[in-house]
Regions:
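Residues at secondary-structure transition points
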Residues: 29-40, 68, 72, 76, ...
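Short, structurally constrained coil/turn elements
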Residues: 52, 83, 159-161
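Stable alpha-helical structural segments in soluble proteins, enriched in small hydrophobic residues
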Residues: 45-49, 78, 84, 172-183
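Phosphate/pyrophosphate-binding loops at sites that engage ATP/ADP/AMP, CoA/4′-phosphopantetheine
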Residues: 42-58, 142-147
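Short, well-ordered amphipathic alpha-helical segments that serve as non-catalytic structural scaffolds
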Residues: 34-49, 95
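Oxyanion-binding and handling regions
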Residues: 1-22, 29, 33-35, 90-216
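DPxDG-like acidic metal-binding loop motif
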Residues: 58-89
């Protein structure tokens, strides 16, 4: 199978691609802007594998939760490849590849959103729960002390010092595993139907709401 998989939901850009004979994977850490390099890296991947977008059997896209800007860049890029050639897309929750590498039975994955708030998802007996966006206080009210709190960044785990914590390492290999399993199970959709998991409003939307509430 020929495929291209991308996740731009965090400061670690994950990519994986295959020409049906071999595959390449890449993890680029601590990126502030995905837009500046994503198209370039994708072209390099496809050139290396000697395939074109029209050759792809499917695409994979991390739909979040995470960086609003990063998700817009990633999903618009995937749509731009999918739509001209009618290539099906496998969407996946960006927390699921992270969960794949965790050995604990019960844990929660957290990723910081705006100040004092986190995206989070519990995995009890490794079964995923609902993806939520809450304040630190609200999260702690709902979490049992026995659960392990996991995050990709040490500075985010500081807010959960009264819990057992675990530092995650984003992996394009685990991302590929999740997406290939989903594709084989028929979990695909059209690029037209690809939607992000935003959960929170952007700063611009918050400011807009604030200005309009003062007018009324």
């Amino acid at each position: 199978m020929k495929y291209l998989i991308v996740d731009t939901s965090s400061r670690t850009l994950l990519l994986s691609a295959s020409n049906g004979k071999g595959d390449v994977s890449l993890s680029l850490k601590d990126l502030d802007r995905h837009g500046a390099i994503l198209a370039v890296v994708i072209k390099q991947f496809l050139d290396l594998l000697e395939i074109s977008p029209a050759d792809l059997d499917f695409l994979g896209a991390g739909v979040g939760p995470g960086s609003l800007t990063g998700l817009r860049v990633g999903l618009s890029t995937i749509k731009g490849i999918s739509l001209p050639y009618n290539i099906p897309v496998v969407p996946f929750n960006s927390f699921d590849p992270l969960a794949e590498g965790i050995c604990f039975d019960d844990f929660v994955i957290c990723r910081k959103g705006r100040e004092g708030h986190f995206y989070w998802r519990t995995y009890l007996k490794k079964r995923p729960g609902e993806t939520l966006f809450s304040s630190i206080v609200e999260i702690k009210e709902k979490l049992d002390k026995s659960i392990v709190v996991c995050s990709e960044r040490n500075e985010e785990l500081v807010d959960f010092q009264d819990y057992r914590t675990f530092l995650l390492e984003p992996s394009p290999v685990l991302m590929r595993k999740i997406v290939l399993e989903a594709f084989r199970s028929g979990k695909i959709l059209s690029g037209l139907d690809l939607e992000p998991v935003y959960l929170q409003k952007s700063v611009a939307e918050i400011n807009w709401d604030g200005r309009n509430s003062r007018k009324t």
